[in-house]
């Protein structure tokens, strides 16, 4: 049977066609249709990746010690005070949710960390996911950075891939702005 075009249909309740249930309104600007996996479609705001805008954490604190980077808060962290010492980054979902429970297997995410440096430069020298130590692979083949860059803004980019349950890979890069 070929497709049948009827024209415009006005539906005052949800439309059921076959096994699919469609919403009875047009949604809001920029909404997308989502499914519950059982054939019911609803309008919702797009999740992640859409729109080309990212939320940042902009902090006037000095980085040192252990720095928790929470995916549920932001993926871009901007620290404007001079770093106060070398630091460890701990990637997690939030203070109450692990990154392991936030990500599915075969998903990736990227964090970016901007660290202001003064006349004494410090650097990221430890890495954790959900409090467990990890060793990143570093871009460029030069190994793990062993210093920061004085009077600059160091930028660290970390791409995290979840390979399996509590099985992650971190691919990292350090660069700087003067």
Place the predicted regions along the sequence by residue.
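Short, Lys/Arg-rich amphipathic alpha-helical interaction segments
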Residues: 168-170
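Extracellular repetitive beta-rich solenoid segments
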Residues: 1-50, 71-73, 80-87, 91-110, ...
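Extracellular beta-solenoid/beta-roll
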Residues: 49-78
């Amino acid at each position: 049977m070929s497709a049948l075009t009827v024209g415009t249909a006005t539906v005052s309740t949800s439309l059921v066609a076959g096994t699919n249930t469609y919403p009875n309104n047009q949604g809001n600007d920029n909404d997308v249709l989502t499914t519950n996996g059982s054939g019911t479609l609803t309008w919702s705001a797009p999740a992640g990746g859409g729109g080309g805008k990212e939320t940042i954490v902009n902090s006037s604190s000095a980085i040192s010690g252990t720095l928790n980077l929470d995916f549920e808060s932001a993926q871009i962290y901007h620290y404007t005070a001079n770093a106060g010492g070398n630091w460890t980054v701990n990637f997690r979902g939030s203070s109450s949710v692990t990154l392991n429970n936030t990500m599915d297997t075969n998903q990736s995410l990227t964090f970016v960390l901007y660290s202001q440096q003064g006349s004494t430069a410090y650097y990221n020298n430890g890495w954790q996911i959900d409090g467990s130590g990890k060793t990143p692979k570093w871009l460029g083949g030069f190994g793990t950075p062993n210093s920061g860059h004085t009077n600059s803004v160091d930028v660290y980019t970390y791409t995290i891939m979840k390979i399996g349950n509590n099985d992650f890979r971190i691919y990292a890069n350090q660069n700087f702005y003067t």
